A protein has these predicted regions:
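Cytosolic regulatory regions of ion transport systems
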Residues: 1-162
Length: 162
């Protein structure tokens, strides 16, 4: 039977960190939410392609490491519209939500869409119910790892995914 996960509750938003003073000046950039297993792979490729990138990350120790490596990073919870504004969401061209918490991802997507209606929004999901939820929050594309694995394996056998 297919597991049907429900979106997880989001922790209360912490107060905004004090190391974000002025909004970033980047424009036509990609904003990446989360620099974990998925986000770090995306970040590496965007850097290799020299695409303008701003990362929003909640873990302070990771923020410091990313900044030391020369990346543009906003420290905070991206579910806060203030944190998104700090990353200059209004001038971004794409938002990639690479975090696993689908409820928080939905909040991020809703705030981002309100701030920038033409933004391309890509999101990660871990279950069918999360795919549906994130699409209702106005994500343009929602990718579920298990579906993609199955699709690629079937394609390797010359079979369509459906």
């Amino acid at each position: 039977a297919r597991e049907q996960r429900q979106p997880e509750a989001s922790p209360a938003l912490a107060s905004e960190p004090s190391d974000n003073v002025l909004p970033l000046s980047e424009s036509a950039h990609t904003i990446l939410i989360g620099h974990g297993r998925v986000g770090s792979r995306i970040s590496q490729r965007l850097q290799a392609e020299q695409m303008p990138l701003v990362i929003i990350e909640a873990l302070h120790s990771l923020v410091e490491d990313l900044r030391e490596s020369g990346l543009s990073v906003v420290h905070g919870n991206a579910a806060s519209s203030q944190t998104l504004a700090q990353a200059n969401i209004a001038s971004a061209r794409c938002l990639i939500v690479a975090i696993a918490n689908s409820l928080e991802a939905g909040q991020i997507i809703s705030h981002a869409r309100a701030a920038n209606p033409s933004l391309q929004i890509l999101a990660r999901a871990q279950a069918d119910s999360e795919v549906d939820y994130l699409k209702t929050c106005s994500a343009d594309l929602v990718v579920m790892g298990e579906r993609e694995i199955a699709r690629i394996m079937l394609a390797r056998l010359g079979l369509p995914a459906d």
